[in-house]
Every structure is written in C-alpha cells, then in structure tokens.
Amino acid sequence: MILGIGTDLANIERIQGVLDRFGDRFRNRVFTDVEQAKSERRLDVAGTYAKRWAAKEACSKALGTGLRMGIAWKDMSVSNLSTGQPVMHVTGWAKARLDELTPPGHEAVIHVTLTDDHPWAQAVVMIEARPILPDVQTAQTT
C-alpha cells in the first residue's frame, strides 16, 4: 500500500547561487557528509546538490509533514547503490514519522527517483508499506 507520494522541482542555478553565497554554512546545514562527498566529486556540483535538495523536499512531502514537526534537512539523506540507483535514508524525526505512518505487520520502503535537465532538478519519492511475510522456514517447522 502507498503511504505517501512527494515531488519537488529545484532550480540548479538558484542552488548554485546559494552555494556561492553561503558555501559550507549551507552545505553543512542541509547535506550529510556522504551527500557532500558525492556532490563535490561530480562534474555538475550544483546539479547534484539540487537533486538531493529536491529529494529531501519530496521525502518530507511524502511523509505528510513538509519540513515541520521537528523534521530536519539532515534527517533525510540520499546515497547511491553501486548501480547508481538513489536510495533515501531517514533518521531522527523523519524516521519517527515514518514509523508512525507504517501499519503494524508492514515494513516501510522508500522509493526515490532523481532527474535533471538544466536548469531544473526533480525528485519523486514514494513511500510503500510492504507486508512482512512470515518466515516460511519457521512456519514449516512448527
């Protein structure tokens, strides 16, 4: 079952302006060390940050709160699998909200997709509640 869907569009040039003006103050307030390391290694630094900004906004919308109720920027973090697929991680208040949304007997799965076409970066986040299936091996032995 779908618990929430969020989307966001970020202007890469605006993010570049914020990076130019506020530098590390902005980076350290919004992005985790992992996100910063990934972004700074990329050819399009601002575009990479913009996609992660959009992902955090989209995730907060999928959680049904936006950036309110104690949820902070760093409570949501994007990393990538070895295949390049983005993965959303939640901690702190965002994790608490996710746990609150997830029905008993289910596990939450966060799906995220990122794209950009200069000057825009976009993210879509969908939160799914997946039923936890009983352990088949345990069921066979009882």
Curated annotation (Swiss-Prot):
Residue numbers binding Mg(2+): 8, 57
Major localization listed first in the record, in broad terms: cytoplasm
Record's subcellular location: Cytoplasm
Gene3D superfamilies per UniProt: 4'-phosphopantetheinyl transferase domain
Keyword Metal-binding: yes
GO CC annotation: cytoplasm
One Pfam family of this chain: ACPS
Similarity comment text for this entry: Belongs to the P-Pant transferase superfamily. AcpS family.
Record-given protein name: Holo-[acyl-carrier-protein] synthase
Natural source organism: Ruegeria sp. (strain TM1040) (Silicibacter sp.)
Lineage: Bacteria, Pseudomonadati, Pseudomonadota, Alphaproteobacteria, Rhodobacterales
